[in-house]
Amino acid sequence: MFGRTYYCGDITEKAIGESVTLKGWVQKRRDLGGLIFIDLRDRTGIVQVVFNPDVSKEALAIAEGIRNEYVLDIQGKVVAREEGTVNPNLKTGAIEIHADGVNVLNAAKTPPFAISDQAEEVSEDVRLKHRYLDLRRPAMFQTMQLRHNVTKAVRSFLDENGFLDIETPILTGSTPEGARDYLVPSRVHEGEFYALPQSPQLFKQLLMVSGIERYYQIARCFRDEDLRADRQPEFTQIDIEMSFMSQEDIMSLAEEMMAKVMRETKGEELQLPLPRMTYDEAMNKYGSDKPDTRFDMLLTDVSDIVKDTEFKVFSSAVANGGVVKAINVKGGAGDYSRKDIDALGAFAANYGAKGLAWVKVEADGVKGPIAKFFDEEKQSKLIEALDAAEGDLLLFGADQFEVVAASLGALRLKLGKERGLIDEKLFNFLWVIDWPLLEHDPEEGRFYAAHHPFTMPVREDLELIETAPEDMKAQAYDLVLNGYELGGGSIRIFEKDIQEKMFALLGFSPEEAAEQFGFLLEAFEYGAPPHGGIALGLDRLVMLLAGRTNLRDTIAFPKTASASCLMTEAPGEVSDAQLDELHLSIKKKVKN
């Protein structure tokens, strides 16, 4: 009964005349004047099966009771379809199976939604509650297959380059890595907790101290953080670490790996080396540290042109150490009314902007609410700086650099999508390099690591650690694809004294550093090699390669935006007995 000879989608005209055995699900059933037609589906596709009393009355009798999503074992002969009945939209559309035997392996209830790609119009909550049905859809299977092919290409490449696939602990200690940890109470050690790893960062560095030299892992990671469309509480990363390698060596190897992934999953050849862009350039031109380079509309600094204008919004911003930047919406003058531009201003306000100034370029100069503040010379300079022409709309932001970059950068992306400027078929990879080592929080009066506390400063900047730490650059690099951060890496600190100075800079007392990272500091005393690595988000990579916009579509059993599983109803309550075993009590129950 289980001797399948073909997958449904693999039968071609070459098999005409063969007797075959197929397994699968009923996609559709049609009863037409004594004949019953069934579209049989498996993971490869669909084939039409015909039940004809002239071939087998017994098979026809069974087929009369079959419904959608029944699981069948079918025997029959491959026959060419009659002229006029060929389906050019189906891979198997030139043939059909004349059934001479059928076994119902399992019956099925009517599913809550049709098993087709049109089901994407159904509520996502319904699909997630019945995820095992959702995964039957061709688009979902293709995404799962793409994910498999990506990891297969990654494993193959790293294996060919001498890497060892080594697992690191899932139950580990809690360390401050940015997001909140998921904590696991210990039954044996009363009042103590494990943490699920936010990344294998410390373990992979310790593997370098161990002399492994080349490590990788398709690693599960966990972060208890606020969610959004491209984040999940549990996620998978391609985790890589190497000893005795420079930043350029690691970037070169990572992009060669991505070239193999693109070649084997999308049939595309990446042009190597990938473009490099400094962090400062990305922020200045794109208003983002993960620039989408598939379209122009770059941010242009016009501070020098407008710094002495009588328009106080501009002149005051520059005088107070801020900037004035602008973007040119090509051909946008006639497309946006004053009301439309006000709506763009409201959008920019979400990113801290206090307003959005604008002018439209006409044949005799610029027109708009602030045009009167620009004499002919300033108008000419603005038009030249922004490469503007008649019919263009110029949008201005004036504030501190961070606010202008964030608001105009977000506005650029919004307008790029709305105006159809983005070629969705493009895969624009690039590296963002020369990152600042630290970020300063003026409210708290302290520094935070821009990446993580284990990133090595640029060697030449080490002398600034005591005098001007805010000016230090990091040996760090992010890989960006189409405006998404695929992942990042860095050369790591491997000398105890530098690591201790970094901890101190981040506000750790010597006692706190020893308590939380003492094992790492001690390991560095036993001959730690220079090392570095990179971690790339597998879920996000698959999302982009599949042309999806939501990480949940790339994970077999994802969580919702509120970090719950609708299918298993996790998280859920546990019994008092379980809590007692773990020496826990619930402080206060809050009903949702």
From Swiss-Prot:
Superkingdom of the organism of origin: Bacteria
Keyword Nucleotide-binding: yes
One Pfam family this sequence matches: GAD
Chain intervals for the UniProt region annotation (Aspartate): 201-204
Localization, UniProt: Cytoplasm
Gene Ontology molecular function, alphabetical: aspartate-tRNA ligase activity; aspartate-tRNA(Asn) ligase activity; ATP binding; catalytic activity, acting on a protein; nucleic acid binding; transferase activity
Annotated family: Belongs to the class-II aminoacyl-tRNA synthetase family. Type 1 subfamily.
Name this polypeptide is given: Aspartate--tRNA(Asp/Asn) ligase
Source organism (scientific name): Bacillus subtilis (strain 168)
